[in-house]
Amino acid sequence: MPARASRPAPGLPARAGLGFKPEHYATLVEQPPDLGFFEIHAENYMVPGGPAHAQLAWLRERYAISVHGVGLSLGGHDPLDARLLAGHRQLQRRYAPDSISEHLAWSRHDGRYFNDLLPIVYDDAALRRVCAHIDQFQQCLGQPILLENPATYVRFEASHIDEAQFLCELVARTGCGLLLDVNNVYVSAVNHGFDARAYLARLPLAAVGEIHLAGHARQRDAHGRAVLIDSHDAPVDEAVWDLYEYTLALTGPVATLLERDGNIPPLAGLLAETGRVTACLARGLALAA
C-alpha cells in the first residue's frame, strides 16, 4: 500500500456531512442531527433573500458549511460567467463557508449553457485553460478552492495526459485542493477499465480537503456493455464503500459528504448512511494514531 498522505489543511471538520435538502428542513429544526457539516449548491442561493437564505442562515449558525458550485464551467473555452463569479463572492461574504468547490468539467460553450457536467480533453491547452480559470476563481474569492474529479463515460483520442496526472498538475500550478469523489473514481474505473486503487495512489492526496460518496446506476450502452452512471439516486454501493475505506487508509480522516439528489428518502434514511461514514472515519482515525 502507498504511504499515507499528510493531512489536508484545516477547513471542514473530518466528520460526516450531508447535502442540504429543503424538504428535510422541518425535521432538522425539530431534531438537529450530530453531523459535521452540510453542503449546498451555490447556484440555488444566488438570490438576495427568501426562504432559502433563511434556512441556510439557520444551518450556518449550527454547522460547518461547504459551498459546491456546478455551473462555472472551469473546463470550458468560454470566459467564466461574471455573474456567477459575483454570486460566489456574495455567498462567501455572507456566510464565510468552510469550503468552496467546483468541478473539472465544462457546461458552457459559445454563450450557451448545458445542464450537465461534460468531460474535457486532457491536453496541454486544456491544462493551461483550466489553470487560468481556477486562478481567476481563486483570485475572486481570495482563497483556494477544491476541485472535484469527474465521473466520465467517454475518453478522447486527443487526450495525451492521464487524468490523475492532470489533477496533479492543476494542484501544483494553482494551489487548489481536491474534492475527491470516490464514487466518481469507481464509476470511471468500471467504465474505462482501469484500476481505481492505482488511480488513487497517483493523486496528490495531501491536497484532499473533502470526500464525496454517492450512489450510481447501472445501464447498458448501444452495444450491450455495462455502463455506470453517477446518478446520486441510490444508496452508496458496497464496492464504493470498500474503495472509501481504502482511500481513508491513504488520506487519514477527511470530511466526507453523503450525496443524494434523486429518490430522496426521509432524513432518517440518510442519517443511517452517514452513521456508516462516521464508523469508517473512526477506523481511519485509529489507523492514523
From Swiss-Prot:
One Pfam family recorded for the sequence: MbnB_TglH_ChrH
InterPro entries the UniProt entry points to: MbnB/TglH/ChrH (IPR007801), Xyl_isomerase-like_sf (IPR036237)
Superkingdom to which the source organism belongs: Bacteria
Disulfide bonds: none
Gene3D superfamilies per the UniProt record, alphabetical: Divalent-metal-dependent TIM barrel enzymes
Similarity comment text for this entry: Belongs to the UPF0276 family.
NCBIfam families listed in its UniProt record: PRK05409.1
Identification of the protein by name: UPF0276 protein BP2925
